Structures are given as structure tokens and as C-alpha cells.
């Protein structure tokens, strides 16, 4: 019952008396509290948090809702009831009753407010209550008393707490009293470190032998598991948020009885936050059958039956030997062991090791015992085996492997290992071997459950110091949430202000009705009350049974521009465990407490320590402390570790509660590699993610489990940070040998700039020194035509993160890219401190916030203009260089401008393949704050210092044509840098920093078509449109600003810098809106020949780091039993393990033997290869001799043929000189067919098709000559006939061809039927050449092995004999086959039969024909794509043809069509067609016979149109198909040689390459 407040004096006296009594009891309780082993926090702990923070849950409500609503709430919600507590007459408080009549008693499990909207409630059990007078708190802390929050579960101090005594009228407490409670913590699964929980999951899985499904597979039940702890804290009663039930289960199998009811949890294990270990809860007192041992029935002692006590024991030693004798014996035994060891190992050191081992001593003593303590006998026995067999010798390699596998699988359960894997070993042997094995190097990476080995690292990392800055308000102002949802004030002020609360909608369940609205959950989204309370209680948003469509207004565009200012990032990655893994480090790790745990300085430290997802977001209302910490930080920043800055950079990007006021004091820099002092995103990843790597753990499983946060594959709109805090890469970067370390200082900037200064490049290409010393620092890696002005006031020596560079939020049509915050990839590779290289400097005289420049209403740019690009300047970004993986020297930009002889493989290439948003970036190069549509991630091979400060987020230009010549110099994963061929009206891509390098040999002026309304300079990056050519030394051409006409850039030397014409118009200040704007002409992209590029020579040596000059010493530095380390270079205090030391195995060691064997093996292989090579050379020589013999025969035959009656029709001898033909067997000059330069419009499709239409090696004239043997071309004058041949209307010609085809097919079928009659030889008529009576030349050709005329072949029109119609052919065919006279009759019959069978099978199986010529079906399919236009029209005509149709005679009907048939250079008459071509074949004939257009006499233009080219190409492809099919037949003839000529091999390789190309 409630005590009355009357004013009479009696009650006043009683009240005073009670107060005195209470104070005495409180003092006693405090003394006993201090004597207790468990730690209780003083008032500076949780109580002071709530006393000072003006915090309550409903205050969050006020922040979440609009201002009008909060004012309305505070006006109309007076408290209904008063909170009160009950206590006994001894002063002990037995219960606390809230205004909602919820009764809390000691022992209850309760929720406690966690302060942060994205953190669930803490769960604890109340130990006891105590009342503290506020005056005690006031004397310790200057904090004001607790104010009345507008609508809250009012803390006791805001009301006079009413006491309920058993007498019924307890005195009223003072308004300044606070009711505190001691609580014992339970830890949620998400609050223990990730690796610890993962090991638990793994152990549970391994120990689950029953195959039963574990209860934690249910995600709901999994989230209900807690871990009890013995840690006690003190909290204010106002933090209570409800009661819950917590059940205990003995193991995970018993937990299947748990039912996930409302407010119910369970625990099995305990968690110790000091040691970061889970342990069983067996220390608790448990009663019941499940916790008691079952003892067997009592067995009476056996009756004494005369057995001695030692009857079943084995005596191993009788201490009867004198010490002197024993020592002499042991000395002799060890000497024998030393001798034996020396004999085995080969060195005295091995003998000493063998003698000093414990095994040797034990063996000697055992032998002495077995010899009845006769030293002589024992020594005689020891001579046979002076050294016992080592334990490792008793185990085979396979057994060791199985043992290690068992350790990994079952831990140190040796019974299980023996049972499952090593049944032949005893358990004792396993244990003995384990203790031997655990000391071997192999055990370091295979240790089972290494999580217990990291505690010292954890303790060091997680320790907080009292100087930790706590300057973050408990919750940011509501305006910081504006960009996170469409329910922000900005969105609704203009349109939905009349809707008031109706405009809100829960971002999880999409309800529009709720008691209040808050941002909460892991992603800080707007939630209704039910969803938020569910999240607060259970750590996850409630499941949605009935999905509801979101209201339409929720799809308003999110304001991406606001993303950077508030530092908010709606990170859709896994912050759940990572961000909360620090759990209660805030309240546990304060070193101020006597037992090592610290009471939280305030509640926000605790909550942010538990799971702060921000970089350094802890709050304090103590402004003095904040100022002191700021000044202390400034001092610390003078010496910054690059690795720390990388870490800080990541945290800065990850921060979700920082504002511009805190940015200057955010980043503390310490020299040691330790955790950030403030709980950060890096700390939040997992409590030991960094510690694993600090310790150097090489266990990939540990690293993998410790870095569980995953980076998003494709960035969401606010997802611009790389959440992966993998410090393995940090260490990798840290241990990289510094590629380039040079003293900082720029050409025109003072080299004596203090480390804290930031060097800001001035916008625009202002004149500067023409030579820049090689710099390793990014501050100087800018083009030489940019002066670096230094802004170094003392007040701004600390590193300013982006607040000064954030552009004002403008309604520009394209969201501006946020500036790159700092280059971690460059600095992490340089161990010496370079703080001046980070950050972008304070807002100095060159302020970068030129907002109006961005307000041009032009069309939205696909590349997104950065504000810096408007001024021609930008901070140095961390865009990693697209350096080759094999590149050993990574040059900054200024060096690429200084080293024109740099070889291509060491050229720092621009990051070309930016169009890969699916590739995860290296975790050490986080993508800075840039809006999402442009936030393409870097591909993984982009690592290393960026040679150009290119904006890493530019998508590639839309029309890119890969530069094919670059592909050979790129790693396989890198695409060739694109050559910009896009139209000139493309909006400008912009770059934050002017690309360096002024020695581009290709004069490619950049495309510049700026927005007409843009006043400032738009820099055109050379990376996107014009990548630096690998063969061209130096960088891209200098950038001409859009305000001046572009000039062609001459190739500049190493120290020359071309100056754009308007550069003088650009002021050296930061703002250039007044720069004169010159109209820009359309830019001509002029492709120059690559011959201009000099052959790159060896690069000049890179500038050395500040370490001492190395001196060659070559002294042995360390020796072991089998090897010796030699120190080759001495660098003083610096050293590099890869270059300064080398390793030499000793002569007799195993490694030396292995190396000798490897050398011998390599020698033998080299000799074998040399022998094989010599044999091949001999074979080739013989082959060449045979070829020369054939050539001579062919020439003789050709001379005979040239004297025939066809001489009158031969070509003009003046035109058949070297320009028109090659020697007969001259191989092509290159391994790939030389392609003449394409003259004509740049249309890739036509260009490709025209290459297909080139004349082929196989051209139809002489049948007896193989197609792959180069011959002289046909009549060059044939080019004059081409216009006449192609002037016919194609449709008329096609129709005539089709009719003629049908007629000829009928004739051929009739011929075939006639020939198949009995009495005729089985040989297709098409196999016969012209009868000698028709072709006089043929007579001579048939009597020689090869007919190769030395000059021009017969005139192409000679074949069209007027009388040689199909009937004439039939007459000639009936005259009998014209076989070689030298062939015997059986040879003839066999040749005819084999040929007929082969041709019949080939015509019926097109795939076989293709495979015979090594053409894959894929290639054939590809051919159809190119040839279906004309060639497939005849397909239906020949499907029904019976019998084998010779593939060489009927061009448009036989077989599959091979359109893309590559060929070596040279134009050959076709040696395979002896039959006279038909008329339509003659139309195609010039395509095979004509030279290239460049070979035409005079200046005759090529007369073929594109349509004719296509038609000729298709006809040719059909011809090629049949020629290919004939190839096997040619090889089968006895007069043909079997080996491939060079041109033929060339031809095959080209064919395969073409076949491998993608369609």
C-alpha cells in the first residue's frame, strides 16, 4: 500500500528516523558488497548512465517521430501511476513495481534497455535492489540529476519513490534517491565472438553421433539460446523493459524440449567474457537424478587370501645401485648412444642429440634393471641397441596422416581416433605420439580447436582505455535518419505533411498503423512498435505470416546524396554477429575495476561496446573530457601507422553515427597494430578476426570463420563500404616489400612539409616544373603540370576525413560521387609513416566545396560528375592499380611519366575492367563513399598502389571496342583496356584527379563535349576513353580541359610536359568557375601506327626506400643440422627476407640430395630433349630434301606444259613478277596469315566478312597439285575482268544457277546410274580429269608426280572449252578412266575401289568429313551461321541424291558448308579441280584467283560492293568445304608426301584458333 503524504510533524520525524536507519544499512551493505568476490559496480556504472543520459524508450519515440508529434506527446501523456518499491523493516528491498504494475523481484530474468535502436535488449537476472542517494552520485560526478523525460517508464528518481513497509506506512524517499539493481548477465548468441560460436556449432555437429537433428537447426530456437555468465553489473531500475523466462538444459539434446514461447529463452553453456571461452555450467549446484552419480552396489573387501600387495604389479627399479656406479654406467651408455647417433646422422651434433635424449637414459636404466643391475651385461646389451627407436620412426606417414585427420575431426578424443582410424595402435601410443606431435611444426596449422590459444591477443585487443573518446550522443538527431527511408521529414514536408502519421509504414511488415515509429533493426529501418519490440527482445525481426504489398509511396527514391554526410550506410551485409560481437566489452573491459572488469563509464559505452556498428560511436556529455581527448589525438596523429590508417579508413566508411563535428577527432593513430580504442566496425566483425592474423595463424578455417562478414556482391544504394574486415589481407599488405618508398615532398611543394600536412593538388593544369622527382607518395603522384599547393596550418595537421570534401546536397540530376577518402592500398604497402598522404585536408584557401558547379541541369551523366572534377582536382583515391599479377615494380604516376623506356609488363596499366560489379573487391581496398549506381567493385587483381588517381566508380563507356593488340599483355583475368570509339556527343566522364603521364605516343585528344551550362573545368580521364597502351611508354595524353580547344599532343620525352593552350586561364585556387569556356570542336580520334612506340628497354631502377643502402656481405647468419642461411645483403636496421637472405642446404643433407637429384633429372631431360630435337631436325632435313626433289620434278613438268598450245593464252610475263607470286614452296613470312590493312569504313562486321572473302590457298586449277602447296597465282589480268563478272544482276544469276544446277544434277545422276551398271568400273566420273584430247596440258601433268608450272598457270578462261558440254564429258568418261601408266593393274583396281568407298562414306557422313580435317562440329555449326544465306538454298535439292557425289565438282550442293575457313597467306590455283568449272563456278573463280586490291596494277579501285563481297565469300566457303574434305584423299596417294609443310601447319593452327573463338 502507498504511504500517505501528510504534513504532520510525527510522520516527519518517523521519516527522518527511517532515513537515518536506511543510510546506516546502506553503508553496511556497501562494505559487505566490497568484500564479496563478485564485482559490483559503483554509481559510475549503469546507474550514472541513466542518471545522466536523459534517456528512456519513449525518448527514442520522440526522436523517431516528427517534432510536432513529440511535442503533442509530451503535452498529453501525464504519468498515470508512480513507480514504487517494497521493502522489509530491515531495509531490504524485496520488489520494484513499475507504473504499469509490473513487479520485479530478485531472481527475475528481465530485459534491460540497450540504448541503441539496432541493438536488442540485454538479458539479465536481478540479484538484488539497493537505494542510492543522489548526493553521493553528485559528489562524484558533475552530471545533473535525472530530468523527467516526457513519456517514459519513469525512473524512480523522477518521482518520490513510495516505500511499502510491513508496518504499512513507510517513509517517503527523497526525490534524489535512485533505485539500483545488481544484475547477472546472459549473453545472446550474437553477443559472443563469432569464432567462439562457430567452434561450438562445429563441436555440436561433430559430437552428434546419433544422427538426430539438433534443435538449433530451427532459426527461431537458435536465436533463443543464451549463455549464462557470472558477471554482475549495476543498473538503474529505469532501464527495465519487461520480464522473461530462461530455462536451463543439460545438453543440446535435452534442449529439444524447449518451446519458443513468448519471452522464453534457454541456456546450456556459460560464457566467460574475460577469456572469451564457453564452458559448461557444471559449476552450479544442481540437485536431482540427472545431476547425481550412480554408484554401484557396495562390494565387501575380499578376504585376505595370502596374496601380496605387489603380486599383480611389475617391478621396474630397485634402488640398490650406488650413485657412483649408476653415473658411470649412464655415462658409458650415453657415449655409446652418441657414437651410434654420430654414425647415423653423420655429425657430432647428431651424436650429442642422441646421447642427451631422455629416451636414451630411460632405455639404459631399463636395460640395467633387466640385466639384474649388472652394468657389464647391460652395456653389452646396449651395444646392440644403444639408441631406442624414436617414436616418429614407429609411425608411418599414412598413420600420421590419419592421426592428424582424427585430431581435426574428433579433437583429442583418442578413444574415438583409435576406434575410427587407427585400430592397430593402442590408446596410450596415441597419447604419447600426440605429445610428441604437438611440438612439431606441422602441428601449428593443424592444432585441433586452437581457439583457446588466442586469449592474450583478445585481452590486448579488446582493452579500452579511460582516454577513449566518448563524444557521440546516445542517438543521433532524427535528421540523420532522413536518407534511410522515405518516411523522412524531407520527403514528407513537401508532399505528405497533411498526412502526419499516416505517411509512415513499417519497412518490415508494411503496416501503416502503429503506436509509434522508430528506426531500428540491424539495418536501422523504420519499424512499427510490434516489429521493433520483437527485434529488441529476440534479436531478429518477426516472421511475416501474411506478406502484404508495400504501400506505393515507399518506392520513392532514396536520397543518395545524403549518404555521405551523416555517414549512414544501409549496409545490407551481415552486421548481425559482427557488429555485436564485442558484446559487453564496454561494460566489462574497463581497467578501472579491481578485478579486471571495468564498470562502464556510462551506459552508452556498454551498449556501443556490445554491438556498436559505428566506427567510434560512444557518447559522453562531458565536454571537457572531449576537448582533452581531441588535443591528445592531435598529438597522436603526428606519427601514423599506414596500416592503422587503412583500418581507420574502413571504420570511417563504416561509421553510421558520425557527423561532421566528430570527424576531426575520430581517427586515433597508434604505432602498434592493435584494435582501435573505440569499438568499431572492425572490432565488430568478430572479436578475434584481427587477432587471429596478429598471431599469425595460418589455419584457413580460423581465418575463414573469424571473418564472417561478407561483402555484398552488388552494392545496394547506400552500400558503399566494404564490410569485409579481413585483416589477413592487411597483414599481407603490411608485409609486402615496399615497392616504392621515397621521401615525401613534391616538385613544387615544399619537401619539408610536416607529416600532418595534406597536400592538395591545385585544380587545373597549371604550369609546374617539368621534371618531378620519383615519388612513392600519392600526394605527388599527379601529373607534372599540376602544382601541389600545401595547406598546412598547425591547427589542421590532423587528418581530415571527408567532411570538408562532401559536396553540398544538391538536387542535381545525377548524384555526385563522393570523394575518395584515402588511399589505403598505397599506404599500406609503405611501412614508414606518411600521414600526409591520407585525407584531403582541411577547408583551407582552396576550398573544395564549390557547390554551384554541380547544379547544371544537363542530361544525367552516365558517369556521374564528382564535385572535384568540376574543379579539375580531386583527392587521391584508393583505386587500385590494374597492375599485372606478375609486375614487380608498381610505379606511381609521376614515375610513369618519367620512365618512357619502361617495358610493357611493368607499365602500370589503368584499371580497365571496371565493368565488373559482380567481382568482390579486395577487403583491403574498401570502396569509399560513392553512391551505388556507380559503385562498381574493383576486380580482385586490382591491387597495389594506384598509378592514376582515377575515380574507381566510373562505369565503362557504352561503346567500347577492345584493342586486340593489347590482349597479349594482360593477365588472363583482365580485359584489354577499351579503346574509346563512342560518338563525340557522349557526356563527359569525369575523373577526380588529372591522369598523369605526358609521353603518350599516340596523339589521341580526349573526347570533350561538356555540358553547356557547366562552368568549371571537367577533367576527362584518359583511363576510360583512352587506356594507356602497353606498348606506348608513359601515361595517357595530357588532358585538355573542355574550356579550351583540344590540341594534338606530341610525344613528350621523359622530362617534357605538354601544356594545354588554356592552362594559363585556370587559376591555381580551388574554385574555377570563372575559367573561360572555349567552344569545343568535335574530337577526331586518330589511330596512328603502333610502330611509333619505341622498343621498351630495361627500366631504370626504381628509387629506393629510405632504408640504408644495401651492402653485399654474404656471411652465414644461421646454421642448423641440415642447412645454413647466408645473409647476402645488409640493409642495416631494415631487411627483406626474400632478397637479403638465401638458403644453402649442407652437402650431406636430404635437401641437398633432393636438389642434386632434381638437377640431374633436369640435365637428363635436357639431353633427351636435345637428342629428340636433333632427330627431328634430321627428319625435317630429309623432308626438305624430298620436297626439293618434288619441286624439281614439278618444274620439269611445268616446263613441258608451258610449251603446249596454251601459251597464247598465258598471262603477260611482266605482271607475274615477285609482286604477284611467291616461290613455289616458300613458307609464309609469319606464323599467322598476314592480314592487309583494311581500307574502308570502320565496320567490324564487314571487316570480318571481308577477311573471310580473301583469296584462299586452295584455288581451282590443277588437280594433281595438293591445295596446301603454294603456287603461282593465276592470271593477274583477271582483276580487270571482275567488274564484268559481277555486273550481272545477282537475282538473275542465282535463278540461272539454280536451273543449271538442276539440269546438271540430272545428268550426273544418269551418268552415275550408267556407271553402276555391270561392266563398268566403279569410279565416279567426277574423279577423272579432262581427257588428254580436251586438255593438252593434262597429258603432261599426268605423267609427273606434281605439276607445278613455274610462271603463271593456264589462263582461267581456257577451261571453258566451247564444245565441252555435259554430253562431251559423258563421252570422255565412257572412254575409260585415264589412270597413270606407271600403275600396275592391281594398284589401279585397289586405288579405284578405296577411293570410291571413301568418297561414298564421306558424302553420307558430314561429321566424319569435318573430323577428318580436324574441324570440330562447333566450328561447322559456326560455319552455318556465316553461310546459310546463299548456300542453304540448294540443300533441299541434293538431299535425295543417290550415290556418292564428288565433293569437288558441285560447289553449291555437296556436303556441309565451311564458311569461316582460315588459310595461310598466298593465292593458289586450285590443284584439285581437273574438271572444267561450270559457268557459275567461273563467276566465283576470280575470288580465288585475284590478288589483293593492293596488288592490282596501277590505281584500280576494288570494284566489289559489299553485297558482291558477301556473295563471293559464300561461294568461296562452299569451295573450301569441299577442298577440306578432299585433304585426306590427297594424303592417301602414293605420290603425295605425308609430312605437313610449314604453310599447312600454319593453316591447321589457324583453323583451330578460328574454331576456338566464341560465336
UniProtKB/Swiss-Prot annotation:
Known partners and oligomeric status: Interacts with HDAC1 and ATN1. Interaction with ATN1 is improved when the poly-Gln region of ATN1 is extended.
Domain notes per entry: The interaction with ATN1 is mediated by the coiled domain.
Cross-link annotation Glycyl lysine isopeptide (Lys-Gly) (interchain with G-Cter in SUMO2), location: 559, 636
Bias-annotated ranges (Pro residues): 805-822, 901-931, 1027-1053, 1098-1109
Biased composition (Low complexity): 478-487, 608-622, 736-761, 890-900, 961-971, 1054-1068
Positions of modified residues (Phosphotyrosine): 1252
Superkingdom in the source lineage: Eukaryota
Gene of this entry: Rere
Bias (Basic residues) ranges: 73-84
Zinc finger extent (GATA-type): 507-532
PTM annotation (Phosphoserine): residues: 53, 56, 141, 303, 593, 599, 612, 641, 655, 674, 678, 1098, 1105, 1107, 1259
Record domain ELM2: where: 283-386
Name of protein: Arginine-glutamic acid dipeptide repeats protein
GO molecular function: chromatin binding; sequence-specific DNA binding; transcription coactivator activity; transcription corepressor activity; zinc ion binding
SMART domains named in the record: BAH, ELM2, SANT, ZnF_GATA
